[in-house]
């Protein structure tokens, strides 16, 4: 077992304490509550202390030296999904966002044959005060500004970022007009899914319940197995180990919050292998005379234009719990569309509009999922700690041949805005 302490993009008072089990994945029940109970017990006992020097001499403290990093590097270079090829003629802008990713990201990209890699100098070295960004989370507006500006100055094909502890990966792609546009986690996850399944079709891929269903459709088209879990990478990796077989080995999993794992070398989200794989995808497309936008459009034309959004809604603190209200009077329609299926993960029951029911094979969680008759989906997650509701929306629009990408995007956005407005008014 192992522990990783990291604040990453969170404020320093919220240092993360991540516990990994012997299988290399983060812990799930019953280990989480078992360890928490032991921690509580430890607070009631005297705490034996030892100096760092003594601990080191007794072999109780082992500093991770360069050989540790080289073993990770070697493992990544031996990952069959990251095998270098000749399609490396792309330009990459990169930022470590004042975190720890730069050395390894640059090393792995060089190992894979990418020679045109420019790093944002001001953000390259670790600095816990994060002086150049308001909030060092690549999902936040403005966090990618410097790497996109660098991308523009070197005419990069992609402008990439790791978050400060380098487990997440974000990318902005050059548009035909020369500007850079961020891809969403779902867009990156779908591109990855298709690209990796082309290499290894009969595989197992998965994502979380709040991520896009496009991956499920892509998996089906490749004859692959698809699975879905609760949010959190601990579920994606532990369930993957349970579900994979010789016929369907685990290939890839992602969550919409920019977390990806490529292959079975790291049983957690890993922003470093992700940047290598995404650069290889970009290089392969460029060698074929295509861009990432072309590929995304082709996926949308094949499967439908999937569009996702999420909102946080503040609720009246004096009103009764929203989950109780929604369960007492389940909505029959949302935005004028009939609710065809309701999934209640708290009771693990899926209810169809004809009243029939079936069990849901997921751990219990305070989440409600509504599938509408037009294939739209609304997911409602009440906060356990404050009067707040997190809502995740997905719409699927037609994308016929006579429609441009811009028109399809506008149609999906209009459909999404209508759904969000109507749903929020109904709460």
Map each language-model feature to its residues.
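Ferredoxin-reductase
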Residues: 1-22
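Gly/Ser/Thr-rich loops at beta-strand to alpha-helix junctions
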Residues: 10-11, 96-102, 166-168, 211-213, ...
């Amino acid at each position: 077992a192992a522990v990783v302490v990291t604040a990453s993009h969170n404020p320093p008072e919220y240092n993360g304490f991540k516990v990994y089990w012997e299988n290399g994945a983060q812990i799930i029940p019953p280990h989480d509550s078992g360890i928490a109970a032991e921690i509580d017990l430890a607070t009631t006992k005297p705490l034996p202390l030892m100096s760092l020097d003594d601990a080191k001499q007794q072999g109780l403290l082992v500093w991770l030296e360069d050989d540790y990093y080289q073993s990770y590097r070697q493992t990544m270079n031996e990952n069959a999904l990251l095998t270098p090829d000749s399609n490396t003629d792309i330009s990459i802008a990169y930022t470590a966002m004042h975190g720890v990713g730069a050395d390894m990201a640059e090393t792995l990209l060089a190992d894979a044959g990418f020679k045109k890699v420019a790093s944002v100098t001001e953000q390259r070295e670790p600095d816990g005060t994060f002086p150049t960004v308001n909030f060092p989370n690549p999902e936040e507006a403005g966090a990618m500004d410097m790497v996109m500006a660098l991308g523009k100055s070197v005419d990069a094909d992609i402008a990439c970022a790791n978050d400060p502890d380098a487990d997440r990966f974000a990318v902005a792609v050059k548009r035909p007009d020369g500007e850079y546009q961020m891809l969403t986690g779902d867009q990156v996850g779908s591109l990855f899914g298709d690209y990796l399944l082309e290499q290894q079709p009969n595989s197992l891929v998965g994502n979380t319940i709040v991520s896009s269903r496009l991956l499920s459709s892509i998996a089906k088209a490749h004859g692959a197995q698809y699975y879905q879990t609760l949010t959190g990478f601990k579920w994606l990796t532990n369930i993957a180990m349970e579900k994979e077989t010789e016929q369907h080995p685990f290939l890839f999993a992602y969550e919409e919050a920019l977390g990806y794992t490529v292959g079975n070398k790291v049983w957690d989200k890993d922003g470093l292998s992700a940047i290598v794989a995404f650069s290889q995808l970009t290089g392969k497309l460029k060698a074929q005379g295509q861009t990432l936008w072309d590929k995304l459009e082709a996926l949308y034309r094949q499967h439908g234009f999937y569009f996702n959004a999420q909102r946080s809604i503040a609720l009246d603190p004096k009103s009764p719990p929203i989950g109780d209200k929604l369960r007492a009077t389940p909505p029959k329609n949302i935005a004028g569309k009939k609710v065809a299926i309701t999934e209640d993960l708290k009771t693990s029951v899926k209810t169809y509009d004809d009243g029939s029911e079936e069990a849901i094979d997921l751990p219990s969680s305070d989440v409600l999922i509504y599938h509408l008759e037009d294939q739209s989906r609304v997911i409602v997650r009440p906060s356990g700690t404050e009067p707040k509701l997190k809502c995740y929306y997905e719409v699927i629009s037609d994308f016929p041949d006579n429609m441009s990408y811009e028109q399809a995007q506008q149609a999906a956005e209009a459909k999404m805005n209508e759904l969000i407005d109507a749903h929020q008014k109904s709460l």
